[in-house]
């Protein structure tokens, strides 16, 4: 082809060869003489070849595409064929099936037709009769089993005689299938797991009979009611009664006959009715027999022959049996005849089973209860419990059906077991109310009485549980009171006191609660068994019950709290159980409810989580014994109740009348606070140590007897504030810590100081004097731990924190950190606690008023501290404090004050400050507590403090002002409670008493009045100022503290300083006086009196604490500042806190005024004083509370003994410098990790702290005496409390290890400190 093609192509050779494609042959020929033309031809050839190839490829591609399309089309057709076959197959299958059936039916029909054609009409009727009768019987059975017959004229039985024909008309109400059919058990419940049929096994056999019985029961009830109404209406007319009874029977008969006849023929019905009417005068048996024998004879026969018809007859018989029985009541012989009559019995056949069970009365009761009976079975088990308790519990639990379970699982362990057994016995009954249908009737008979109770206890099976609870007193108080009080939780004020009485009675019962631990553990296990019920109970008992418990448990716990703090029990008494009672009544509603919501979940958890709760309680109790008791009891309720009993015994011994309850309430709150503190300690291991120290400290605080009386008002306020702060403050754990610390500080002045630091809300005096205790608690933990602790507590008591910081330079860093926390907590404590307390009860209002004042006073103290902002400026907290300086409101420099004191230990404390800055980080705890406090701070603090201050100060000013000598502790405590309601109160109550009595008596009354008035205004301002706090936690706390201090200065003798310069100027004057060592000593003394003075009245205290804390705190800071200001200029702060522009003399006079005006400030300064009490305990000489005396003496000396105090205070300051270092070292011990030296000092100072505290108190007399005094006084004051104190120490140990393994060393030190603190404060108090 190639050749041919080129050959063929050659002819057109005329065409240029290079313009046409060459053939292969041509190319070969010209290969030897290749030319450009050959190239062109080759190119053309190649191009043509390429085009051909491409075209061929396209063609092939098209062909392939066509093939693919064909294949797809073929595939589609194939599928269509498949579908067609499938459709055909299905269609044929269906058609075949239908066709077969049709064919068969047709064949049958044809055969039947043929047969029928053969039969006559009569034969057809005869054949149909059985079928019709069977259908009628089935219908009647359905009506009987599935419907309840309602008689329209049931109420008009008399008029029914005339309208007998109309009775044929029936109203059918479908039955509730689940009345007879119990629901399955709760998934996961014990019965559910144990029984294979999960509660549904019996139904298959019983369902039909039960259903029919059920229907007959309902019908019989209706008939009974009708008959009864007929009988009563026409009781005299036997014919009427018979007629009416017949009517009702006729009604049933007509119903059966009607339906049977409706299916059959109306003629039969008419005949039956006519025959029945004619026979109505006769007995029911005759009538029924006649009617049944009449047209229905076939039906009756078939009913007898057929089981189903027979059943219908039985149902009818039973139906009539109630009517007959009723009629029998009217006519006994007919009843026998009716029952004997098989036809009549067949009419009542529904109740044939019930005949034995029910006479009409029983049956009617049963049926009335039948609806109840379903729940009644639950009551059957519950019946034993007193209905009143169930009544209370029902509202409290408010858990509808499951309430009983909740109570069963939660409220009783053993009771719950019993109830579970009962539930198992009555499986249907176990479902909230649904009992087994048979059980229902049996239960109805048994529970007819129970049903009455049942409805009350039905929801609260705990009623039984309650009964068992007395045995399981834990639950009785815990859940019974919880739910009872929950119902009464709102009126918690009354409820709390009532619950206190209950708690006492329960505590008497609770003493057996040693048994209760097992029950509690059982309850825990049972709760575990029923996680759902457990959760529900926890939800209700923790939340609702938490409130109820907070009311009831707190009320009952107050005694337990007293037991918690053996020292605190007495201290509660000391601080005034009246105030405690007020708190109890008011606190339980608000603070208890709130505190216990946070607390009680743990309390409830104590049963569920015994170790945590117990740990918290043991720490909160500050008594290892009590903690162990509670653990053994397995529930804090038992422990709280036992402790409450012990505490009540002690309290009654100490405070006997009002103070016993108050002490109980206070300490119940203290418990809560401790509990929360425990939580906080869980959050912060250092806090755990602090909590231990706090708890150990409380025993120390308790010893001062004189302080107790004065403190008693304060303690209630303290605790009300504590609980209120606990409740109101978003940071309940922190508040609780503060409260715990406060509760423990109450034990003794040394404890007060230690507790103050533990509280962390008492940064200045608390950290200074309480620094050792805080250090004890946080000594093994790092200074951060102490600071975190302080912060946690500080959140409760921001002002106290500031004070503490000012008081001890070591604490200053903590104070800085605590500032934010305390500031946050302070507002919360004041606003939340005060407002809620005020809202909840007058007592709380009164107590809270002092508390509010305490908070305000504490704030003022802090404000005074902020005056020494420059002092804090030196510290790392300088930022916080510098902010305080920059912000007038930030006179929060009270924290700087604390920093001044801390600054006084600048070498270590500057580190401590930095470490406290680390504590700021550690303030994770703070932030956790602080953040809630912050949020509450502005709104709750300003609004609540304003409301509370306005209300409470008025209430407390008169009562607390008179208390100044004895109430100063309360006032001081109240002052500190503003930031740390409970702990500050307690601590300061101890130190303030002496000072308030000595230095603040004459000054307290006048100064308090002015200060309180000013404090109210100033506090409001302070709140406003505190809110704008620039820094997160510290600056807010510092600002608020400084603002509060400014306000306080404006309010009271501190007002002499000027409110605006009080912080800056006040601090400057304080610094100036402090610069002079003598002046510093006197100022320190003055600060102590201020604190002591404010302690005088809770209201005055808080106000004075505000006004006085400036001077008092500043003075106090400068007292310790005298020691420190030399090193850091803390003195200038104290001078400033004494009075903005006051000279040492002016400061002393102002301080005395403040001590008078600021018993709260003394208390607030009490933190400083607490630290001073650790250092200038000379004040302690004068009063049972050396710290208070120190403050008081300091104030008095500042005025009268200014030089003495300068020398003594200076010496105290020197020892305080050491002591403060020691105290602060203890605080630093909390901060210790950052400062090993401080920690060592803390170790040495732990004993020294007690010694220093003793010395401080001794400085009032003699510093060395202070130590012995504290030890001796604490012991003598609280012999019972000494045990509690030691147990508190033990608890502190237990809680410390629990909280932190890292705190082991610090725990040991803290324990030693705690014991020392207890010994010293006890001795000091006892000596005084």
From Swiss-Prot:
Residues 219-231, 248-273, 441-453, 797-808 have a biased composition (Acidic residues). A motif (LFa 11) lies at residues 1117-1124. The keyword Zinc-finger does not apply. Residues 1-219 are annotated as: Sufficient for interaction with WASHC3, WASHC4 and WASHC5. Residues 1016-1034 have a biased composition (Basic residues). A motif (LFa 8) lies at residues 832-840. Residues 347-1328 are annotated as: Interaction with VPS35. This is WASH complex subunit 2. A motif (LFa 16) lies at residues 1277-1286. Residues 288-323, 627-638, 894-919, 1196-1210 have a biased composition (Basic and acidic residues). Component of the WASH core complex also described as WASH regulatory complex (SHRC) composed of WASHC1, WASHC2, WASHC3, WASHC4 and WASHC5; in the complex interacts (via N-terminus) directly with WASHC1. The WASH core complex associates with the F-actin-capping protein dimer (formed by CAPZA1, CAPZA2 or CAPZA3 and CAPZB) in a transient or substoichiometric manner which was initially described as WASH complex. Interacts with VPS35; mediates the association with the retromer CSC complex. Interacts with FKBP15. The keyword Phosphoprotein applies.
